[in-house]
């Protein structure tokens, strides 16, 4: 059976899980917390991982199939269901959301999770193997500072990311304003899957839809709750939630 190397609550990993589950691909998920994932990911990638402005050569998800491996969420979606990439417009939107949306919804989520005492530990306890979750209790001060530095999780970074996410949310709302059910027309594509998965950190889908357990909204700060509620009410957030409801199937 194939193995999927993940950071379980990562929205890029959710994108890959969604596609694999939708296509009925059998796999066993190997879950790692940030930092704990580096060695297993490098080993699984077998030199195929790539570093860019938003990821490293040890980035997840990685799908391991015997002696072969596929690195990156879009490559895994394409492997699972090639027909989802049905036009150049779909290809362009997937690339745009990967590069211009995903890093910013991630930063917004980490701004609130790392800023709220006990929230990152709750995320680990709910999703990671017990040994890793226990080890995090000792490693969290160092790991938290490294995550903040690597992902530029600070107030100016958060505010920049809100501007970026708002802009893409407004683009999506405008695209859907003519009444079309999906971003490129009448058919669900990789663009819809990618947008919904990468928007998920700011709408927090429930565990019956998302492939990991995200923190309940009541544990967030007042600012965090207001941010999530604003994105849930936005037409783009409503569209993302509808994609989860209509198209996200469990394994």
PLM segments and residue spans:
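GST-like domain detector, emphasizing the conserved glutathione-binding G-site
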Residues: 1-133, 247-250
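Conserved aromatic-histidine-acidic binding/catalytic patches
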Residues: 4-11, 64-68, 93, 97, ...
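Long, contiguous hydrophobic alpha-helical segments, chiefly transmembrane helices and signal peptides
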Residues: 12, 60, 194-195, 240-243
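Short acidic (Asp/Glu) and glycine-rich catalytic loops that position anionic groups and cofactors
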Residues: 57-59, 147-149, 174, 219-221
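GST-like fold's C-terminal all-alpha helical module
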Residues: 101-213
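Short His-centered aromatic/hydrophobic patch
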Residues: 198-250
């Amino acid at each position: 059976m194939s193995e999927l190397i993940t950071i379980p609550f990562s929205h890029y990993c959710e994108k890959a899980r969604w596609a694999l589950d939708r296509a009925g691909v059998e796999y066993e998920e190997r879950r790692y917390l940030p930092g704990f994932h580096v060695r297993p990911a490098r080993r699984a990638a077998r030199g195929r991982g790539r570093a860019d402005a938003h990821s490293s050569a040890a980035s997840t998800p990685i799908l391991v199939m015997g002696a072969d491996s596929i690195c990156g969420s879009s490559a895994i979606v394409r492997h699972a269901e090639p027909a989802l990439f049905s036009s150049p417009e779909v290809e362009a939107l997937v690339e745009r959301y990967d590069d211009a949306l995903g890093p910013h919804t991630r930063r917004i989520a980490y701004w609130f999770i790392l800023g709220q005492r006990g929230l990152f530990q709750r995320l680990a306890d709910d999703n990671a193997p017990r040994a890793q979750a226990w080890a995090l209790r000792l490693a969290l001060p160092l790991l938290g500072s490294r995550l903040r530095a690597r992902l530029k999780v600070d107030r100016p970074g958060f505010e920049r990311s809100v501007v970026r996410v708002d802009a893409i949310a407004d683009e999506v709302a405008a695209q859907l304003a003519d009444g079309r059910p999906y971003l490129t027309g009448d058919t669900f594509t990789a663009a819809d899957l990618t947008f919904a998965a990468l928007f998920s950190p700011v709408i927090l889908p429930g565990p019956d839809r998302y492939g990991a357990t995200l923190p309940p909204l009541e544990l967030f700060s007042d600012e965090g709750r207001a941010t999530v509620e604003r994105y849930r009410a936005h037409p783009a957030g409503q569209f993302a939630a509808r994609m989860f409801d209509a198209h996200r199937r469990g394994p």
